[in-house]
């Protein structure tokens, strides 16, 4: 079941923490999150899943930044969130999507117990000018049935900045590396 906007407000500072919080950003069943003024872009192409790919920071000026089409930008929300006993999910706002701007490519699903800023995987189908502090996406909450095991991963928990991929740290790739050396 998805929580209503009124229920989000009722659970604020309990199961749901959003800082800073502004009641004007509440929707009927979600809360709008704003775009921070920093982005990151990967410096090399192609990227390698097994490597810590270098990225550089870009600042979005107040008068906007023109994004290139078919290029991945990593951004983050201004708002810090914590979610307890609920599953947080992130989606782009329909007005943003209608401009051909995607705010998450695949990672819109959060875990019970996640604490931090949401890293956005921003991708546009045509050049588009973006601005800092715009309400770019919305967070909504699902209730959980059954016993809850809170999120404990150290990869992204408690982040304070934009997070590039840490897939290279995954255990499965340690196995893959071992397999590569034995198969050659």
Each PLM stretch: what is its role?
Residues 16-20, 58-61, 105:
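Glycine-rich, charged/polar anion/phosphate-binding loops
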Residues 42-56, 88-93:
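Short Gly/aromatic-enriched secondary-structure transition segments
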Residues 20-23, 64, 108-110, 127:
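A generic local secondary-structure boundary/capping motif
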Residues 174-181:
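Conserved small/polar residues in nucleotide/adenosyl-binding loops
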Residues 32, 40, 69-132, 137-150:
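Glycine-rich active-site loops that engage anionic ligands at enzyme catalytic sites
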Residues 50-70:
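A short mixed-secondary-structure module that forms the rim of ligand-binding clefts
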Residues 7-8, 12, 138-173:
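Conserved, short, structured surface segments that act as functional micro-motifs
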Residues 1-37, 45-48, 164-173:
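Short, low-complexity N-terminal leaders and the immediately following helix N-cap/first helix
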């Amino acid at each position: 079941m998805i929580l209503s906007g009124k229920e989000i407000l009722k659970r604020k500072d309990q199961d749901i923490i959003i800082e800073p919080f502004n009641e004007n950003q509440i929707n009927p069943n979600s809360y709008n999150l704003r775009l921070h003024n920093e982005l990151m872009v990967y410096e090399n192409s192609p990227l390698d899943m097994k490597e810590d790919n270098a990225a550089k920071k870009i600042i979005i000026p107040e008068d906007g930044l023109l994004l290139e089409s078919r290029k991945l930008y990593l951004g983050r929300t201004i708002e810090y969130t914590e979610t307890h006993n609920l599953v947080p999910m992130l989606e782009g706002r329909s007005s943003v999507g209608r401009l051909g701007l995607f705010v998450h490519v695949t990672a819109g699903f959060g875990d019970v117990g996640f604490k931090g800023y949401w890293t956005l995987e921003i991708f546009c189908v045509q050049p588009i000018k973006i601005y800092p502090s715009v309400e770019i996406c919305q967070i909504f909450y699902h209730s959980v049935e059954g016993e809850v095991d809170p999120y404990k991963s150290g990869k992204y928990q408690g982040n304070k900045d934009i997070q590039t991929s840490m897939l290279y740290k995954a255990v499965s790739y340690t196995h893959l590396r071992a397999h590569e050396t034995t198969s050659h």
